[in-house]
Structures are given as structure tokens and as C-alpha cells.
UniProtKB/Swiss-Prot annotation:
Enzyme class: oxidoreductase
Name assigned to this protein: 4-hydroxy-3-methylbut-2-enyl diphosphate reductase
Pathway where this protein functions: Isoprenoid biosynthesis; dimethylallyl diphosphate biosynthesis; dimethylallyl diphosphate from (2E)-4-hydroxy-3-methylbutenyl diphosphate: step 1/1; Isoprenoid biosynthesis; isopentenyl diphosphate biosynthesis via DXP pathway; isopentenyl diphosphate from 1-deoxy-D-xylulose 5-phosphate: step 6/6
Statement: the UniProt record of this protein carries the keyword Oxidoreductase: yes
Transmembrane segments: none
Active site positions, chain numbering: E133 (proton donor)
Keywords in alphabetical order: 4Fe-4S, Iron, Iron-sulfur, Isoprene biosynthesis, Metal-binding, Oxidoreductase
Gene this protein is translated from: ispH
Length: 315
């Protein structure tokens, strides 16, 4: 069986930056304890488990404001997905030390939205309902930012404003965004369009669209809550025409998916640790459908290998 290692795949710079920021916080003895992350720093349980080993507490919940109410003291890290101005204000009110690990691409979209709101625009924001990135973006001004996920959501919009801008969550499928933007343009011909798919997401999606075409099956290594990982599986099926399965790690691979495959493509979400993906590739490369001894799927990557290395600060 041939394993097609789709390139590029895995960690993007926004994810690495966020993890390095969080690790440096853990190593800084001057910062007040406890140290919390407001939601998952990135959508990967292996990463949050590794941070737990370092004494960083990940708090999750329905929304960032709700999670914040659980914290009375210490240091709070804002995740790569960004937060609303209201969350930042509330953290200041509570006297918490805050560290912002928002991805620069998300910050860029927030700044664009703020600029357009100041010019009197209403914003249509294409994103995944219940995901923290749209929550942070829409939270800039919930009365003038309209979250849409589907064509039906667009049809339900009733905006009466000469100034309308449409933009999007950075990790959406670029094909879905293009389709929804076209629908918005049809409904509001005067709309100003700003496609904000981040370059890392775009390159990874295009790589799957092209490189998974020849495979019998695609394995996407990524957390179930990772939007960009789920979109890679979608791109494999809808654009490359190759059946795809998303797995959190090697233990979730079903032998039935691969036993008859001649070629298996492998990619990974932007928040998937490289050693976790390597373990999947190593398993597939040694897999023999006729030898049950090669079927054992066991995750052996220690948590210490999950996070990027940083230098400890000298006291």
C-alpha cells in the first residue's frame, strides 16, 4: 500500500505561536497563579492534555464570557481563536492578568470588521455556529454583525443598509465561502466582499484537493472539534472525490477503511501535533492487510513530545 503524505499539512504558524506563548506563561514565575486558558488553546485534546501536565488549566464552556465567570484570580490566556471586546473588558474588571494568544490572521479580520463598523457598515460573517472564532468576531457588535453558515441563513437576512460587508471565519472551506459569498452578492448586489481564509488553511485545502485525487481513501488526523480538520475531510470528499475519515490519533483508524486500499492519503489539521500524525503515517506504512500482526493501533507519543520546545526564563 502506498501512503501519500499530503504537503503542506499540520501545524500552522498561528497555532505554534499560541502554544509557545502558553508555554512561556507556564515557565514565567512572575505571573500570578493559577494559569487558565479560556477554552481550548487550539482545538486538539492532546495539546490541552500536554498543557495540563505543565499546570495550565483549560476551562471550556458554552461561551468565553460564561467561562470567565468561573475565574476569580490568576492569569488568563486567550486562545488562538480570538475573543470579543466584552471578554477583554470583563477580564480587566475582575483584575485578571491577561495574555493574548490570538492568531494574527484572526486579529486582522477583527480589525477589518471594526474599521467597517466605524464607517457605518453592517457585517455578514460566514462561520460555524458554536465555534469560538465567530463568537469572538460577532461579539465585536452583535447587533450589526450577522452570522451565517448556510444558504438558508443568507435567505433569512433582512438588512436595510447601503453599506454591507461580507467576510468569514479564517478556517472555513474556501469553496463553501465562495458559494455563500455568491449568494450574498445575489441578494445584496452592493455588498463589499472580503474573503479572509487564512493562507495556511487555503494551502492545506488546495493540497488535499489536488494530492488526494489519486488515493482510495484519505485519513485526516485532527481533533473532532477542529473546524479546519473537518473541512479537510470535506474537501477530500467534495473536491478531490476521495472518501475521507477524520481520526484524533492512530487508535481511531478502522482496518475496514484501509484493508482494500492501494493508496491512502494522509493530511493533518493545523492544530494537530506532528508526532501524532507521524504515528499514523508509520502505522500505515507498515500495514499489511494479510498480516494481522501489523494491525495493532497504539498511541505511544508521550505528552512531553506534543508541545513545541521553548527556553526556560532565567530567574
Amino acid at each position: 500500500m502506498e501512503v501519500i503524505k499530503i504537503t503542506p499539512r499540520g501545524y500552522c504558524y498561528g497555532v505554534v505561536d499560541a502554544m509557545v506563548i502558553a508555554r512561556n506563561v507556564a515557565l514565567d514565575p512572575t505571573l500570578p497563579r493559577p494559569i487558565y486558558i479560556l477554552g481550548m488553546i487550539v482545538h486538539n485534546k492532546h495539546v490541552t492534555d500536554a498543557f495540563a501536565e505543565e499546570g495550565i488549566i483549560t476551562l471550556d464552556g458554552e461561551n468565553r464570557l460564561e467561562i470567565l465567570e468561573k475565574i476569580d484570580k490568576g492569569t488568563v490566556i486567550f486562545t488562538a481563536h480570538g475573543v470579543s471586546p466584552e471578554v477583554k473588558r470583563r477580564a480587566r474588571e475582575k483584575g485578571l492578568v491577561t495574555i493574548d494568544a490570538t492568531c494574527p490572521d484572526v486579529t486582522k479580520t477583527h480589525n477589518l470588521i471594526k474599521e467597517k463598523l466605524a464607517d457605518g457598515y453592517e457585517i455578514i460573517y460566514i462561520g460555524k455556529k458554536g465555534h469560538p472564532e465567530p463568537e469572538g468576531a460577532v461579539g465585536i457588535d452583535p447587533t450589526r454583525i450577522h452570522l451565517v453558515e448556510t444558504m438558508e441563513d443568507v435567505e433569512r437576512l433582512t438588512i436595510e443598509n447601503d453599506r454591507i460587508m461580507v467576510t468569514n471565519q479564517t478556517t472555513m472551506s474556501q469553496w463553501d465561502v465562495a458559494d455563500i459569498m455568491a449568494k450574498v452578492k445575489e441578494k445584496y448586489p452592493h455588498v463589499e466582499m472580503h474573503k479572509e481564509i487564512c493562507m495556511a488553511t487555503q494551502l492545506r485545502q488546495e493540497a488535499v484537493a489536488e494530492q488526494a485525487k489519486d488515493a482510495d481513501v484519505t485519513i485526516v488526523v485532527g481533533d473532532p472539534r477542529s473546524n479546519n480538520s473537518n473541512r479537510l475531510a470535506q474537501v477530500s470528499e467534495e473536491i478531490a472525490g476521495t472518501k475521507a475519515y477524520r481520526v484524533a490519533d492512530v487508535t481511531e483508524i478502522d482496518i475496514n477503511w484501509i484493508k482494500d486500499a492501494k493508496k491512502v492519503a494522509v493530511t493533518a489539521g493545523a492544530s494537530t501535533p506532528t508526532p501524532i500524525t507521524k504515528e499514523v503515517i508509520d502505522f500505515l506504512e507498515q500495514f499489511d492487510p494479510n498480516d494481522p500482526n501489523t494491525w495493532k493501533r497504539e498511541r505511544k507519543v508521550p505528552l512531553q513530545k506534543i508541545l513545541p520546545k521553548v527556553k526556560a526564563k532565567k530567574e
